[in-house]
Amino acid sequence: ELELTESELSTTYPKYQDGWDVTAYPDGTLVNHADGSKHKYLFWDAKNCRTRFDFSKGFCVAGSDTESFLKDKLSYMGLTEQEMNEFIVYWLPLMEHNAYNLITFQSDAYTNSAKLDITPTPDSLCRIFMAYVPLEEAVEIEPQQLEGFERKGCHKLL
């Protein structure tokens, strides 16, 4: 179950109907009980977001360097090639043509405003939420310290 405390759901896939009812398998496959469809992840997007994201630490990246930056950081955070590819395919068109991007990977601001209730609890859970602001000029910012993700037993990437 997903509980948004500072926004409303706008798009979900598969359809979110009072929660997702899926079975997770050790290879990461999710089977949706509503229609039997198989998924690698559950997608949601929000509107009317009132969360105040933390931009006190992060990275100022030239738009032309966004792809290599994301590959490096996402790999460090434990994503597989396929997971990185899907993340980059979604975000790169929005970011690479900006002069610069101020990029942060949110933790508490994200997990506190988008709470998950997963039953049974997975052995490991990776939640990556990137926030960015397009910039015309580079800015100095304290680099953000990122954490890696170790996959153990039944794991989920959200």
Regions found by a protein language model. Give the residues of each.
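Protease-labile, long low-complexity intrinsically disordered regions enriched in Pro/Ser/Thr
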Residues: 1-158
